[in-house]
């Protein structure tokens, strides 16, 4: 069958586990400090939502009302080594006086946690392979128990390396928001030139990805040219401009957009009721930076 599938993608391998402290900045946006990279991540498994969803019937409708509890993701992280960043910055363990050991305190730390999963896709248009990453962020992640492990005595078959399993939970954040909404987790996908820029930024200084993080090489909307117009009748506020509902992006794709018209004072205006003056039209689409176009309306002669 000749069907129009999306680009083929696969993801494999974990790397670059970063933990950081998060607080609300002066402008209300997250601020991150004390970034540390944690070595030895093997896997992150079964981050399942433990919140119950209940339906309440009424009349002949089985789901007259639906209630869901607060989102609580629970799962585990597996490590092949436990370094200082894991012991002190996540598990809150106390280092011994001689600096050689750590002891549990039960004072587990809540951290913003980010890790990467390698990815590769085959572009549906060019057929070329493109490398990238899936960036997973848990804004509020806390251990729920000390790390567990198993060891075995050497044998003729050899032994497997010890792995430490850490039970964790992730909850919604009041600071790390997506579109004004609290989220317990976000997964980003970055490819090609954006992935290269992400690596460059990460190598120059550890950082946590945010919904408004801008990376070089992003596909952007192309702002349209809107023709200037005159009002329909002299002396009346009845100007109408041509506002497209789709735009081209920088790779030639067609994108459905929404738009808002504002006058020179920033007040929202209604198309078809425009007074003589200058207006700015802002175009928006999910996954793209907003673009604007200017247009003027003159009085009918």
Swiss-Prot record:
Spans traversing the lipid bilayer: none
Domain of life of the source: Viruses
Gene Ontology biological process terms from the UniProt entry: symbiont genome ejection through host cell envelope, long flexible tail mechanism
Ranges in a coiled coil: none
One Gene Ontology cellular component annotation held by this UniProt entry: viral capsid
Subcellular location: Virion
Classification via Pfam families: L_lac_phage_MSP (PF06488), Phage_tube_C (PF20608)
Classification via InterPro entries: L_lac_phage_MSP, L_lac_phage_MSP_N, Phage_tube_C
Record's keyword terms, sorted: Capsid protein, Viral genome ejection through host cell envelope, Viral long flexible tail ejection system, Viral penetration into host cytoplasm, Viral tail protein, Viral tail tube protein, Virion, Virus entry into host cell
Record-stated family: Belongs to the skunalikevirus tail tube protein family.
Function: Forms the cylindrical rigid tail tube.
Subunit structure: Homohexamer. The tube is composed of 31 hexameric rings.
Protein name, as recorded: Tail tube protein
Organism: Lactococcus phage F4-1
